[in-house]
Amino acid sequence: TYRESVHGTALASGIMDAPDCASCHGEHNIIKHGESGSQVSPEHVSETCSGCHGPVGVAAKYGIKTDRTATFEDSFHGIAHKMENRTVANCASCHGFHDIRKADDPKSTINAANIVQTCGRVGCHPEATPQFASGQIHVDPTSKESGLVYYITKFFTVLTAGTLAGLFIFIILDLFRRAKKAREAR
């Protein structure tokens, strides 16, 4: 329930920045969550969550990582969401709705003991295995914490820059050669 969630317990302990019902659902124009105009519809829920969990939200004030919106948007799920696929996982699909808990809470949908079940929900990955569910979700390819993804990103950045630099050099050399041939032909 909301009262037992990270948001509910934070609000109960006096943290007024914690979201209450109106923070997610709106104050006067509450629409059913399945309708596209709702702030908590699959179409809008990631934007609603990013209000607090994004780079300009209140998350940093409480030591919560603020890259979650960006890493979601760069993930397979986030890219599919940008392409207007509304059946793809969003924040609430994995973290839950009213009963959002810290990852180390045994009742959390993203707890290591529960992640296979979370990924394996009908409509998501029903064949999910522990190996499948062990993959990193919020990956920042610019952070060394991302391990191999970081080094692959660096490799392709250097490869792309090197390829473009090489092409630029060949174009310049070709232009000089053509100019020299044109001068010799006169």
What feature does the model see in each segment?
Residues A179-R186:
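Cytoplasmic C-terminal tails of single-pass
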Residues T1-Y151:
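Inter-heme linker and motif-flanking segments adjacent to c-type heme-binding CXXCH motifs
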Residues Y151-L175:
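Selective detector of the "anchor" transmembrane alpha-helix that sits immediately C-terminal
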